[in-house]
UniProtKB/Swiss-Prot annotation:
Descriptive protein name: Krueppel-like factor 1
PROSITE patterns, sorted: ZINC_FINGER_C2H2_1, ZINC_FINGER_C2H2_2
Motif 9aaTAD in this chain: 71-79
First and last residues of each zinc finger (C2H2-type): 275-299, 305-329, 335-357
Coiled-coil stretches noted in the UniProt entry, renumbered to this chain: none
Effect of residue 295 to N: Loss of DNA binding and transactivation activity. No change in interaction with SIN3A nor with HDAC1. No effect on repressive activity
Subunit structure: Interacts with CBP and EP300; the interactions enhance the transactivation activity. Interacts with PCAF; the interaction does not acetylate EKLF and inhibits its transactivation activity. Interacts with CDH4; the interaction is SUMO-dependent and leads to transcriptional repression.
Sites of Omega-N-methylarginine modification: 178
Residues passing through the membrane, by range: none
Covalent cross-link Glycyl lysine isopeptide (Lys-Gly) (interchain with G-Cter in SUMO) as placed by the record, residue numbers: 56
Tissue specificity as recorded in UniProt: Erythroid-specific. Only expressed in bone marrow and spleen.
This protein's UniProt keywords: Acetylation, Activator, DNA-binding, Isopeptide bond, Metal-binding, Methylation, Nucleus, Phosphoprotein, Repeat, Transcription, Transcription regulation, Ubl conjugation, Zinc, Zinc-finger
Amino acid sequence: MASAETVLPSISTLTTLGQFLDTQEDFLKWWRSEETQDLGPGPPNPTGPSLHVSLKSEDPSGEDDERDVTCAWDPDLFLTNFPGSESPGTSRTCALAPSVGPVAQFEPPESLGAYAGGPGLVTGPLGSEEHTSWAHPTPRPPAPEPFVAPALAPGLAPKAQPSYSDSRAGSVGGFFPRAGLAVPAAPGAPYGLLSGYPALYPAPQYQGHFQLFRGLAAPSAGGTAPPSFLNCLGPGTVATELGATAIAGDAGLSPGTAPPKRSRRTLAPKRQAAHTCGHEGCGKSYSKSSHLKAHLRTHTGEKPYACSWDGCDWRFARSDELTRHYRKHTGHRPFCCGLCPRAFSRSDHLALHMKRHL
């Protein structure tokens, strides 16, 4: 008996427990209603849809007639009979979805008590069911503020630069030639502003080339520009100026003066006409004696060059005339037109024909 008294509870305790179970059953009937309630764990997410949990009653259809849809529990009475630890900052209203019954507002389950861990009525019968919507809302981390670039000063606003051209290659305010990254310079930038940027490619050494080729020191026209100014101009402009200075220095002219043009044909000294025709009324002179002999044949009528073709008695004073005549018999035409298939036996005939193609 002593062991039974220590194990079994008293009759008064069992009586109180029976009333407690009846109250739990009534609470479950009220809680599991056919209405759709918004039991979201926290404030609605602006980027996503609101969470709605539809709880359907598991009571048999016979008990629906006994329930009064107009009755509702008094929240003050419920909080008085079943106190619980209320977490601060969770006072929110839970509105029933529109249905056939009247619309009423109740306190959310978070304001009725901490059902998951605090002492309350719902801990026992509802503790076995895992409802994520009854848990306390977890604090949401603050959203990162959008990045706002600092306002630029009025003088530092970037300006659109024109595309690269040969005429502006390496000039101040333009772009470096043959470069993937454009480094524009301000129009009023002082000398040496771009000296920190390395050369994108080695500049052609025109000055050294002229020194090695001619064996002379390249003279400088005027004063020497400072290195910072050369870096600001860019490699293309520096190389061009050095090359122009070297060429002008070798010619003894200023950089702006073009060197005089030289003819490719060298004029040979003119031969003196030492051979003069002695026929009366003819004073022609020739540099060669053979030319004078051919000319005298026109006065004397001598024709030493006769045609050897059978049946041809033509005779000529010059050998080249006999050669052209002989081509008439053979049909040889060495002078061909490059624009058409025609050919000629004489060069002067080909020259006249080429004028027709012009």
